[in-house]
Amino acid sequence: MVAGAVAGALIGAAVVAATAATGGLAAVILAGSIAAGGLSMFQIVKGLTTIFELPEPTTGVLIRGSFNVYVNSRNAMRAGDDVSATCSGLPLNHPLWPFPVLIAEGSATVYINGKPAARLQSKMVCGAHIKTGSQNTFIGGPTERVAFVLDLEEWLHTGLEALGLAALAGGLLLAAMAGVAALVGVVAIGGLMMGGMALLGDLGDRLGPGYRDLFQGVAGMALLGFGPKMARLGNAPKGAPKTQVPKGFEKVYGKAPAAKAEIDAVADGLAAKHGGRVAKAPIKSRERAMQKINNDYKGDPTKIKDLARNTIIVEGDKVNTVAAELANRGAKVKVIDGNADPLGYSGVNSTMNTKAGIPGEIQVNSPEMIYAKESEDMARILLGNDTYDAVAAKAGVPGGQGHKYYEDWRVLDPKSPEAQAIAEKSRAYYDAVRKGNGN
């Protein structure tokens, strides 16, 4: 039965391995499934053996025996004295024993030559037991063990029972931590399962010996299917998943308001000097900032550059002038050339270190680029209706298409025909918008 129990335990472990449970829930389900699988296979093997009267394998032959006491003309066997020549260990219930194996158990009330009388089912030190003997002589009394027994089968059975009880206790604890409703639910489900097992046992007893074990064992294996379902319930998402907070994030994010005030003051001064305006974006949200840090900067919050950001909007012929002044102030300026950009977009991105200790981002765009890349509602807010309508009249194409082209293009292979077709349309679109003196 050891091999069957191990197989059942492995089945239980495999069932849980296919789930996504983690932490305490996974430990409870894994322990419970291993115990259920092993104990169920114990019962299945025992039930089938009893029902079909399957013969047990012979693993050894008893030798010696009492020199002066006989049972049906055969030497009576004594615990602590007589042996089996060897033990083959089959069917993996106990280890191979290539030397004499002592009888370890006998009757506590019947002695032969001062030794407990061995009888059917008395165990050997290897864990095997005596399976044949006299059919008409019975030796009574409780069992006395006179030597250590390497009883792997009994140890495994006891261990699986203990594991099952531990899983039950852990499950009740987790349910209690989850709330009264969860605890009541677990107790109710457990009660139904135990009641069902009892009914199956009663039905099996009516059919004959062995059926109780068979029915309960098969039901136990079937119940293993509840393991993955419980894991999925325990791991069911409760709203949107929380983004992991990068180490040092709070310190960096706390500097964003001061950085924003500083770059907004710089942008206001340059816009006033060159007849433009400033689009002041709010500080990037905490959730979006953490996502970007985790995805783009491997969790390093010191590398994010646009917690504080704004855009200076000036006429196209002044974009490069403003960019040069930002560079003179120490900003790292990147000029995006429409002829080199794959989608034809043009503009200026700059990163400026602030006294707050984190960088801020200042973009420089012409009204035409704002018209092209922003939605109409946003572009009208940034430019004002008069400027928006004037750009629209010069461009002769609808606004806001640049961002749409970008979103369609970025999910494709840049070398694919579809991506190249979108890029060509985007370049033509930006060229059309730039007719109105956009950068």
Curated annotation (Swiss-Prot):
Gene disruption: observed consequences: Deletion mutant in PA14 strain displays an approximately 40-fold decrease in competitive index against PAO1 strain.
Compartment(s): Secreted
Pfam families xrefs: PAAR_motif
Record keyword Secreted present: yes
Keyword Secreted among UniProt keywords: yes
Record keywords: Secreted
Chief location category: secreted
One GO CC annotation: extracellular region
Catalysis performed (reactions): AMP + ATP = adenosine 3'-diphosphate,5'-phosphate + AMP + H(+); ADP + ATP = adenosine 3'-diphosphate,5'-diphosphate + AMP; 2 ATP = adenosine 3'-diphosphate,5'-triphosphate + AMP
Superkingdom as given in the UniProt entry: Bacteria
Function: Type VI secretion exported toxin that pyrophosphorylates adenosine nucleotides to produce (p)ppApp. Thereby, depletes cellular ADP and ATP to dysregulate central metabolism in competitor cells.
Protein name: (p)ppApp synthetase toxin Tas1
Organism: Pseudomonas aeruginosa (strain UCBPP-PA14)
